[in-house]
């Protein structure tokens, strides 16, 4: 079991180091065998006492904040970048952005009021130190997929494993 960004996980899959991966990011579905594990809310998070907590935030108000985000290659980051791009923006539109590869450190910095972030609800579910906010179209529901190489017996094995 390993946690890493989408690009690294796919490289490990192709290198035979992993049998299957669970991806929350964007990948080439024509290149791999995949099936939907579940749909997961992708949300904005902030410190619990932040003015955004519990609100729907207009995009232009977000840009005055420090954005704390995952490293390039991360599925979580790719989703945010794609949604921003569709609205004509990049992460550079934010007052500042900090790139961190650890969800644990991102959680800590956001809970301390150092900035806002976007990630899957499961990362902070039932944790009272965080406020949640929405900012359509940046937030919404996205797929979590089980991904493996084509033409192997792994899809059936992965399904059985996940049914346990």
Tell what function each PLM region has.
Residues 134-164:
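A late-sequence structural motif
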Residues 5, 58, 101-102, 120:
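Short loop/turn segments at beta->alpha junctions
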Residues 13-14, 62, 107-113, 146:
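Hydrophobic residues within well-ordered alpha-helices
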Residues 1-4, 24-25, 91-102:
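Short beta-strand-to-loop elements that line the ligand-binding cleft
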Residues 1-30:
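Central regulatory/effector-binding core of bacterial HTH transcription factors
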Residues 32-68, 72:
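Flexible hinge/capping segments at coil-to-helix
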Residues 25-32, 103-133:
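A ligand-binding cleft/hinge motif common to bilobed small-molecule-binding domains
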Residues 67-88, 155:
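Secondary-structure junction motif
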């Amino acid at each position: 079991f390993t946690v890493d960004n989408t690009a690294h996980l796919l490289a490990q899959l192709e290198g035979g180091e992993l049998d299957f991966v669970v991806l929350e990011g964007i990948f080439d579905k024509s290149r791999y065998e995949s099936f939907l594990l579940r749909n997961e809310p992708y949300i904005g998070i902030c410190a619990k006492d932040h003015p955004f907590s519990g609100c729907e935030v207009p995009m232009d108000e977000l840009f005055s904040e420090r954005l704390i985000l995952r490293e390039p290659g991360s599925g979580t980051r790719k989703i945010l970048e794609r949604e921003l791009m569709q609205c004509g923006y990049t992460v550079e539109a934010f007052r500042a952005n900090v790139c961190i590869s650890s969800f644990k450190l991102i959680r800590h910095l956001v809970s301390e009021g150092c900035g806002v972030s976007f990630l899957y609800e499961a990362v902070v579910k039932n944790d009272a130190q965080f406020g949640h906010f929405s900012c359509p179209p940046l937030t919404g529901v996205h797929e979590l997929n089980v991904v493996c190489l084509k033409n192997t017996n792994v899809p059936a094995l992965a399904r059985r494993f996940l049914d346990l």
